[in-house]
Amino acid sequence: MTDGGAKSAVKRAVGKLPSAAEAYQAWAAGGRPPAAGFALERLQAVLPAWLQSVDRAGPHVRLAPGRRLLVFGALSWWIEYAVALSLLLTAAGHRVDLAYVAHRRWMDPTDDFDLRRQQAYLARLLHSLTARIRLHDLSRARIPEMPPALESSLQALDKIDVQYTRQREALDLGVGGEDQTLLDLRSRRNRHVAAGVLRLLQGGAYDAVVIPNGSILEFGAAYRTARHLGVRAVTYEFGEQRERMWLAQDDEVMRQDTSGLWEARGGDALTESEKQAITDLYRARRGGQLWGNFGRQWQSAPSQGALAARQSLGLDPTRPIALLCTNVVGDSLALGRQVFTDGMADWLAATVRWFGGHPETQLVVRVHPGELLGAGHPSAEIVRQELPELPAHVVVVRPESPVNTYDLMELAHLGLVYTTTVGMEMAMGGIPVITAGATHYRGRGFSDDPASMPAYLESLERRLAEPLGRRLAPEVVDLARRYAYRFFFEYPFRFPWHLVRFWDDLEALPFDAVLSPERWPQYAPTMRALAGEAVDWSIA
């Protein structure tokens, strides 16, 4: 046996001894987390100041009535965020419990010895919270037999987790399959969390559970368990805007359900300043520029004009062009959003296959720039698998391409999307759009939304046969612009700290500033929504 193998064997044996890992963590390791774990030194350093800020908070912060809340966190960055959020909710007068798991990575196994050391490390680090917040470590919650409906839901989540991790929809889950080991790991982890949340919610009268994301990993397990029991689940995430968060109640926030907002505000005409704001945002997105509190550049290069794009791609101006904009395969904004295909990759393959037999048309596949960060099943490969000899009328624009998507939109006769917001923007420009996934703007009145493959292909043929140069009716374009304004400017909730820039945002807006009489009122509606109070979308 190698030295490494012997060490692992010893750790496995010691990991089964009561209190051995905890004693090692306290005495031999000097409180340092295991190499396989994670450290939260920044959180440890600022916790005393955060607690003092909460104690100093004035009566203006209290939100009546106080509610009982369970806040959940997993992975180091979300645990840091969950602690800060729990303290804000405590300052607002709520009774808060914080549940978490101690695993460093969602895709790697952790032996019992290191896991128990990490648990001991977190328990010690978070101990100062216990005077105000009850802590629950769900890392090794005993797994009972799950209710059949919840078990079925968790099995669906397990598969989504593997797709998310592998960044591909097609999985090898046969005996000995390369994805089966990961599926087994995700199954155990999700059931530990589900079991712990089930026990807590059945044993206490919680008003709401507050969960990041809610669509994947342990976050999805907590969400699905809360909904199984009928307990209000509040999910939250962060997009491209600073000082804003996305928030949903009794839904996965990544589905971005705008139904309540659209019902309350969809009929309101845009004011002149609102029209200008959406026009300026669109111009910035096209030009690859930062704008307002949007912290992302949407294009790697500014617009060079439609003519330059046509010439660089060799497109024929006499034949209709369909612009297909992909999602990132395996992204949580696209997983589980299928309507009439098995997923985004299946839809892309079916669409490419159809266009391969229709040379009287042209298809431009604009691959999402996010694939530059990695893709288990790249969109370009999906196209090649369907059309190994790529015909001239099917063009793939790779994620690293400097070709500006908005230049391609000027050339497009038809837009094809799964869930990306580019479809909404094409409709704003008068381009008919067909949606294939359950995107938030599906059914809002400015896109074609087929519910079956035959209906999709019929819509394709009909739209492509329309005269070149035709555009959507002005009232439909106006509807798309109204929706886009509501989505970009009114759907996000005001909040001081973005997850990606958490520590920088905290330096700019520390606890005392957020809890001050001057700033707290602008965040109070978000805090009420996070606590599970119904959102009044009629208030702009």
Regions found by a protein language model. Give the residues of each.
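Histidine-anchored nucleotide/phosphate-binding helix
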Residues: 76-98, 102, 223, 343-356
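Nucleotide-activated donor-binding/catalytic signature segment of Leloir-type glycosyltransferases, i.e.
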Residues: 380-399
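Conserved nucleotide-sugar donor-interacting segment of glycosyltransferase catalytic cores
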Residues: 192-248
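Nucleotide-sugar donor-binding patch of glycosyltransferase catalytic domains
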Residues: 247, 434-479
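A short, glycine/small-residue-rich beta-strand->loop->alpha-helix junction that serves as a flexible
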Residues: 72-82, 211, 333-336
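Conserved N-terminal ligand/cofactor-binding loop architecture of enzyme catalytic domains
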Residues: 2-68, 91-191, 238-302, 504-505, ...
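Conserved catalytic-core segment of nucleotide-activated headgroup transferases in glycan assembly
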Residues: 287-385
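A donor-sugar binding/catalytic signature common to diverse glycosyltransferases
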Residues: 244, 401-448
